[in-house]
Design a protein with these regions (language model features):
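Internal/C-terminal transmembrane anchor helices
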Residues: 2-19
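Soluble catalytic regions of membrane-associated enzymes that act on cell-envelope
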Residues: 14-116
């Protein structure tokens, strides 16, 4: 039993010393936006516009990077309610050659379910 316990780390080292992925091109620069807004503050209606303005500003500062990523549920509203805002961000980003990745909360058409 003791021998088996000693063998496990050696076997794990052999198995883990493998390339599990392969490079498929040059590295991609990514801008990751972080508003650092506490969750309990961000979702207050009184802070909605300030939060949206902050993320628009951070996005504009990152324009030109190939990929701009916002944290999951960074924007304090349902995607369904942010269509004009998201359209402006998308247009600004694509005009500068940037792609946006966002994690958004979305409501079903009847509003009975929410998805992330």
């Amino acid at each position: 039993m003791a021998l088996a316990a000693l063998a496990v780390p050696w076997i794990a080292a052999l198995v883990l010393d493998r390339d599990w992925t392969q490079v498929s091109g040059p590295p991609v620069r990514v801008a990751i936006l972080q508003g650092a807004i506490p969750q309990d503050m961000k979702w207050l209606e009184a802070n909605r516009e300030t939060t949206l303005e902050l993320y628009a500003k951070l996005t504009r500062e990152a324009l030109g990077e190939p990929l701009i990523v916002m944290p999951e549920s960074a924007l304090p509203d349902l995607a369904n309610n942010l269509v004009p805002y998201l359209g402006r961000l998308y247009n600004e980003a694509s005009a500068r050659g940037s792609a946006l990745v966002l994690g958004l909360v979305r409501a079903s058409d009847d509003g009975s379910n929410y998805f992330n």
